[in-house]
Amino acid sequence: MSRFSGALQLTDLDDFITPSQECIKPVTVDKTATSKTGAKITVQEDGYYEESESGKQKLQKVEITLQDCLACSGCITSAESVLITQQSEEELLKVLRENAKVKATGDMEQVRTIVFTIATQPLLSLAHRYQLSAEETARHLAGYFRSLGVDYVLCTKVADDLALLECQQEFVERYRDNEELTMLSSSCPGWVCYAEKTHGNFILPYIATTRSPQQIMGVLVKQFLAEKLNIPGSRIYHVTVMPCYDKKLEASRMDFYSEVNESRDVDCVITSVEVEQMLNEDERSLSEHEASDLDWPWSEQRPESMVWSHEATLSGGYAEHIFKFAAKELFNEAPPTELSFKQLRNRDFREISLEKDDKTVLKFAIANGFRNIQNLVQKLKRGKGASYHFVEVMACPSGCINGGAQVRPTTGQHVRELTQQLEELYKKLPRSQPDNAHTKLIYRDFLDGSHTDKSNELLHTSYHAVEKLSTALNIKW
């Protein structure tokens, strides 16, 4: 059974994305005198499609690539990951086996350096699953991955920090240029793909250009780490462990393909539930694998911990961190350490504001889940959403901690109960301060400083409105 997400149904607006095997990607078929119009084309699991009206007639094999998915406006989110073949544990294990064979021949020029990057949310999901602490989980995962032939196992801390630093500066610059224009976060690929496909040129100017931590990590691994190892970036196979399937599509965007290295910044994305599946197939619990320290190649001094939180929110802390920075930078105000967001319609839509001289000078919000996202977009279209200066937007209810590819609840356990338990684990983590010695070193030694042409090129991206299909009436909702 496929473990990829599927088409978003209207009844799923506040729940996990579920699998589907249908795709409306138009395929050119030679017409014959007996051909009928209006037939539905269904992609089958074995790689061919069938025309449903005239019976199960085997047609020419069709291949749908990730680029087809990204260029297709048929699905309203990036849930087309059901079609992904190069972003799976099977593909990963194949690469690891082939690399081991090359090593055995002694042809070291052809050996690839395998690098794993693990995000915080999957660590917490797997920690809960195997009843370990976050740090213990990180160390046992490092040992397990190394037993498979992985060379380096990293955390996302430095990329998380850089994403926050870039996003906070981007917000301040935008505010000074045009304080009326709402800025929307950009780290959630499900939200970005939905925006490109459904609202296009209207919504894209609102979205921050700062890359997600996954893609910042891709640049650091394929360029900065490659320089340190004195190998071309194309010799590195970079794998990330993420909480949602949409990260697979994000890694496959052509915006994140390096012409210099002739490779993607992130070659493969696997998810929490796929790691669990790999461990199940190994028939050993995570704690049974030898523990090993994570690598820290960015500076000589290692941080005291490898698993960090970023403010109190569970999706990177964008709203809280940027609010505090902007209050100080723009208005010389120092908000309290712990911010108090006001809940609106539900726990997934909250807001906070800063008052100065009887005027609201900053108004931020957090909008999780597609129901709240749709309400937000409609407000923007009606001109009412402009009251927000910044909105942290995440496609999944409760944010990344409840990503669609996190380990599933046990029998009898509700999703919200599991999410609350993961939230408690997150709150116990040490809190990272992004402006630290490690990020300063990367700005100095790799990016030629902050706000430079190189940092703008490598830490920011662009978006593309997807043209609507002429066959839009055939979309299955």
UniProtKB/Swiss-Prot annotation:
Pfam families: Fe_hyd_lg_C, Fe_hyd_SSU. The keyword Iron applies. It comes from the Eukaryota. InterPro entries: Cytosolic_Fe-S_CAF, Fe_hydrogenase, Fe_hydrogenase_lsu_C, Fe_hydrogenase_ssu. Gene3D superfamilies: 3.40.50.1780, Fe-only Hydrogenase (Larger Subunit), Chain L, domain 3. Signal peptide: none annotated. [4Fe-4S] cluster 2 binds at C188, C244, C396, C400. Component of the cytosolic iron-sulfur (Fe/S) protein assembly machinery. Required for maturation of extramitochondrial Fe/S proteins. This is Probable cytosolic Fe-S cluster assembly factor GL21135. It comes from Drosophila persimilis (Fruit fly).
